[in-house]
Amino acid sequence: MKARKRLVLVILSGIMLVSVLFISGVIPAMDKTPYYDIDRNGKPFGHSVFTLYDDRVYAAVPSDGYFLIPGADPDSFRLLPDNNNHNGRQFAADKYHAWCGNLPVADFNPQTAVTIGNGYFTDGKNTVFCAPYTRINNELSALQKLYQEWRYGWGLSDKPLTYYYPQQPLPSSVTPYRILPDSGLISNGEQVFFDGKLMPGANPAALRPVAVRQDDKSVRESRVFYHDGEHVYYQHHLLPLKDTESLYGFYLGNLFQEAYLFDPQTGQAVMNNVVFPPEYAPYRVISYYGQHVNQGLFLSRRGVYFYDRKKEKIRRAGDNPPLQDSCQEISPLIFTCGIETRYLQGAESWGGRKSPGLISRSTMLYRLDDNTADNWVKVGDITSHHYGEVWQKGGQYYYFDRLGASQLMRGPIYLIPENTTVRALLSDDLRVDDLRKMAHDGRLQAVSGTEMLKATTRYKESMFSFLNFSDDD
């Protein structure tokens, strides 16, 4: 018994010693870089990410704070001419190095460095892309970061680099690189590059952005999809599509990380560089609106498909709902299908105290439980800002929301139990906060609906995950 107690004490003492040593390094690391003093007393280099503080140069790395640039020469440190804008604020040079954020640019002459534009720089011989955005350092694991934080706290290593400004050298070229008009891409007359990466086979003379349709029916040029009459690209990725004049791109509400491309001639759909299974085309998006959804849902010959952001692939949500092809979208995310009314709505599932964090995000297609034969009649818009709409079905009034979940409105359709609320909604001086209060105090009430279809992206497992019987793949 005494030996066992002695062993337990030794183990506990060891754990405490390791914990003390670990904390003794991590806590000093948190206060080692004087962020507040740099912000308050540092001297910024123009509108760049660089600041001179205490005769040393620091670079601001979004999501990671300030980084000391040990090799930077403060006396000769400079921004390049015509480089004091957003796309060039992360690039600088001194008499020894060129800098992309806090990292040096290899094989680059800082004395002859000039700006080309759109994040591209050249020394007359070598050309490099230095991104104006940061990217997470996937080579640094959580355990490695903690270990490096500990070493940094004790002064044994540099601050761990969790985020960084990506840089990409371009191939040597006899012909100087130039920015292509209207696209922001760069070319030497033979090859074309997106963010420093080759777009294989692209024709620089014909390459142009794909048209992107907006919610207000206007059209803008894509910043990620391009075509040249033969090839189609997402960023630098060559897509397995033939170029057609009818190609167009679109986004769904607040799902800004998901850029969609659609070919009406073939019915083929693409999300970023992920192609929907061609064998199930033609596809048709159920709704182009996304204020209340977490996934874009596409009808096909084999059912409804969506992009799973966690698994990074196209998945099957279920069978096509009956008569969905004949439904009419009378307002964003709200449909009439004969005497039925259907609507799309998103939901999130979060863990509790024992397992906190986001578990899943879903998008459901519901059938409104009120299926009376009365027609829908639009009563009016909610202010000139078009926050939403008031509709009537028989003797019942409803509020159709356009603000979305990001504005704390939980669903696209609400029941209006009192006529006084209808008059308040149609008031010209109604504010967004008034709508939130109405939804909170019951003047706008959640409707009752029957779930017809559900698409779920699961970010972590819960104790009820085994109850998920939705189709997959």
Predicted segment positions?
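Non-catalytic tandem-repeat scaffold regions and their flanking low-complexity/translocation tails
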Residues: 22-473
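N-terminal Sec-pathway targeting helices
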Residues: 1-20
